[in-house]
Structure formats: C-alpha cells, structure tokens
Amino acid sequence: MLIVVSPAKTLDYESPLATDLSTQPDFIADSEELIHVCRKLTPLDISSLMKVSDKIASLNAIRFEEWSPIFTSDNSRQALFAFKGDVYTGLDAASFSDDDFDYAQRHLRMLSGLYGLLKPLDLMQPYRLEMGTKLANDRGANLYQFWGNKITEKLNAAIEEQGDKTLINLASNEYFKAVKPALLNADVITPIFKDCKNGQYKIISFYAKKARGLMARFIIENRIATIEELKRFAVDGYYFVSAESSEKELMFKREEQFK
C-alpha cells in the first residue's frame, strides 16, 4: 500500500540526521517555476497571501530568494527530517532502521505546495507555501491548478512500483484536494481518528495529526500489506470501530486523555 501525508509548517534543519542517504525531488523544474512567482512577492504580499506574521513573511522572502535548483547537503535535508509537525512527531523517523527507510522510500509520499510530491529521502530546501495558498501563476489561479494532474500521475507511478492498488490517505483535506481520486489507479482508504472529549467523540486536530503519523509508522514498521492488518492498529490507545467504518473510511477512536 502507498501512504500519503501532509507536510508541516514547522521545519527542522538542526537535529542530527538518522541517515545520510538522500534522493532528488521529482518536480524541481516545477518548483523553480513557483519560486520565480514567489520572488516577485514583497514581505507584505507574503504576509497578506499566507496570513502570517511580518517576521515569518520576511523569513520566507529570504528563503525564496536563496532557493537554488541545485539541491545539496549544504542547502537541503531529507524531507522526512525537515518537516517537524504533529504528523512527524507520530512518525518519529529518527528511530527508523535502514530497512524502515528503504520501505518508507517505496511506500510513503508527502504532498507539498512547492515540491508537489516528495519521497521521504528527497532533499528539500526550507520553504513555506501551503497547498491552499491562492498564488496566481501561469497555469491558473492557485496551486491546485498549477499542479493539475502531475501529482496524481506521479502517485500512479509509485502505486505501480510498490505492487498493489491501495492508497492510504493520511493527509489533510487541504492537501488531498491536490490528488484526483478518479484518475488514481488505486482504492483510496481514509482513516479517521476521533478522541473522546467531555463524553463526545470528535476529531481533535492535534491528536488526529499525531495519529496519522503513528499509523504511517505502524504501516512502515510492520510492513502492513492489507486493510485487515491495518484495522489492527492499536497504538496510543486507539482502536478500530467496525460499526462506524465503511469500504472507504476506517474509524478509530480513543478514550479521553487526561494529562
């Protein structure tokens, strides 16, 4: 099965790397095209477009300016280590074995506004450009129009390479909108994670993001190959709820967390 996850806003270019192995992104020319668009933006433009502080806007103006189509260990690091958000806390790639990295490279993909689709060990230069950003470009009014069918076609290639026709959607709605399920040569299965809060089960963003990372790790670490095996996911107190699941959605719940 192939797993897709969202990227993270928070980045880490300081922590030690668990492997020196790296690969090149597939869409460098497309990324460079977007960078040329972004370089025309002032920090004020960036702040308004991305709804970020002046400090973050200025930082990203510098990042756009310094971005290079040549990816090296000096200006980049592997995407799996560069992203540092709740999903990646759950994934905990720093503790992967060499075999885990090899498996992840074939079975995990990260969606990205700037890079389109990343393999775990693809080198990545720092950036901030969320998929939902309404960045006008030569291909359309936003990044969904910019990427068109490219991400889906690359996913189809990865699906073909890894050998079965199942895609596990652990990405957010904002990012999965960049994928066109009707054109995918795979069944899309979307796990849903609900936590109990004040007696009601609901999707709590922080917990759900971390759970997506935990499930991605579970699949990678245990070489999960079937949906029946995936239903056995029982990490951090989550359990499968058959009565609230369907062919396309798998429901997992967890009792209230008291700190």
From Swiss-Prot:
Q: List the disulfide bonds.
A: none
Q: Which residues form the signal peptide?
A: none
Any one annotated GO CC term: cytosol
Q: Which InterPro entries match?
A: YaaA
Name the domain of life: Bacteria
- Tell me the GO BP annotations in alphabetical order: response to hydroperoxide
Family of this protein: Belongs to the UPF0246 family.
Q: What is this protein called?
A: UPF0246 protein VSAL_I2547
What's the source species for this entry? Aliivibrio salmonicida (strain LFI1238) (Vibrio salmonicida (strain LFI1238))
